[in-house]
Amino acid sequence: MEKVLMKTEGILRAEEVAPPEEYCEKVCLYSIRYQSDDCEVEGYVGFPLLHNGPWPGLIFNRGGNREFGFLRPEIICKYAQFGYAVFGSQYRGNQGGTGQEEFGGADVNDVIHLIDIALKVPCVRKEGIYMVGHSRGGMMTYRACAIDKRIRAAGIHAGLADAFIMYDRFHDGEYDMRQDMQDLIGGSPEEMPEEYARRSAVCWADKILVPLIICQGTNDWRVIPEQAYKMDKALSEAGKEHKLIIYEGADHSLKGTTYIADVLAWFDEHPL
């Protein structure tokens, strides 16, 4: 598969790496470097070993920003083990990549270009692709779902849907998200309201092109449940196909819930 990946237009480097031990017999994992605009971006690709191809492709969009919350092999393998060819990006400027991430600005192209690449890999089905985003990756997913019809269905894990709420509410004595958002977006909501609206899917839910499932925990203090409720309301008012699942007591990680099974069931309901 390394040679196959290297022959794929847009991939600059592909190296097989060892997956986490629990996935050694289930997933073949690769570290990749790919072209996105004028940037070279780092990422991972995972292929299932126990399922025959061609496989449906899945783009996983990581959370965090810069080196915080960087993409780890475990999440690629978690989805790949179920029969998906999973592609994930660190976004530009991170983990050795070039350029500068913009927290939902031009770096959304890193997701779109990864779709281009995934659909060119011979063992990946060509009819469309699935997408999943966690936290900040939810914002990236919403943005992609408003511009790319190749996405068949998407799942949002504790996803950022309102950048104004995120700016106002995600800060405590140890960590202040406001400075990160100012650094990456270029200013505060008061200084750059258009840029914050651009990163807030609640402001343009009518533009969403893709059936969505939104998974949210009630005890999430990073991306508070209000964001999911607002997005659910906005999608309903826009007449968009979607489903909201609330996990009582779950935090930002959604650990201990059925969120992965729920997302995969949603994909099964929307076959390629």
Cite the ranges covered by each PLM segment:
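Alpha/beta-hydrolase active-site loop
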Residues: 102-122
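C-terminal catalytic histidine-bearing segment of alpha/beta-hydrolase fold enzymes
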Residues: 229-272
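Short substrate-entry loop that stabilizes the transition state in hydrolases
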Residues: 51-55, 60-99, 164
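N-terminal cap/lid segment of alpha/beta-hydrolase-fold proteins
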Residues: 8-51
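Alpha/beta-hydrolase fold nucleophile elbow
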Residues: 124-135
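Acidic catalytic loop of the alpha/beta-hydrolase fold
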Residues: 219-223, 253
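Hydrolase active-site cap/lid region
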Residues: 142-192
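Short beta-strand/loop motif that positions the catalytic acidic residue
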Residues: 208, 214-216, 220
